[in-house]
């Protein structure tokens, strides 16, 4: 599954890019469809996303609910600052029997000056003010996840890939994060081909 074709920059005209509202939900729907078709392994390419939602959209499509203090469901990245509770009771159980491999094109962490919002937010249409808001939202998301399931999304290498989606999938569905080009070179046994 190529995230750029489901939740990508290429799908939105530059004047319509707005990472405060852009969601990775469509990518999650494709993953769900793959599970419907019986997939036991999903390889997810994460380049070119229009999103900075920490993978919340993908995870929502797979059954996870993100809630405010008054139990209102969070839909947009701009609302992550209000996240208090994460309900995983309805997560798609088929994920337990499916290996998810995330092909990452960067090594950036989720937060801070080298994080998902600061480095990649501007190319997705974020103003400096939006970058601050998105980073604060992702920080809150990371803290709630750490308290809830004991995984620190902020320390995951390549977790900043695709607006933090890599970190979210690592935390909730035990996705394996790998270097995209290295994965494909291994897949085609490139080293052997070069020797021959």
What role is predicted for each listed range?
Residues 1-46, 50-196:
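N-terminal loops that bind phosphate or other acidic moieties
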């Amino acid at each position: 599954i190529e995230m750029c074709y489901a939740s990508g920059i290429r799908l939105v005209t530059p004047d319509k890019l707005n990472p405060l509202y852009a969601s990775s939900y469509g990518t999650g729907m494709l993953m769900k469809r793959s599970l419907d078709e019986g997939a036991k392994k999903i390889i997810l390419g994460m380049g070119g996303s229009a999103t900075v939602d920490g993978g919340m959209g993908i995870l929502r499509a797979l059954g996870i609910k993100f809630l405010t203090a008054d139990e209102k469901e969070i839909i947009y990245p701009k609302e992550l600052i209000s996240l208090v509770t994460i309900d995983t009771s309805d997560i798609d159980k088929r994920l337990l029997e499916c290996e998810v491999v995330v092909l990452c094109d960067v090594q950036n962490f989720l937060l801070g000056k080298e994080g998902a919002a600061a480095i990649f937010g501007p190319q997705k249409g974020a103003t400096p003010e939006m970058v601050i808001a998105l980073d604060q939202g992702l920080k809150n998301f990371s803290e709630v996840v750490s308290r809830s399931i004991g995984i620190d999304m902020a320390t995951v290498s390549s977790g900043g890939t695709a607006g933090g989606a890599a970190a979210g999938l690592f935390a909730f569905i035990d996705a394996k994060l790998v270097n995209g080009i290295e994965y494909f070179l291994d897949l085609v046994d490139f080293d052997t081909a070069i020797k021959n």
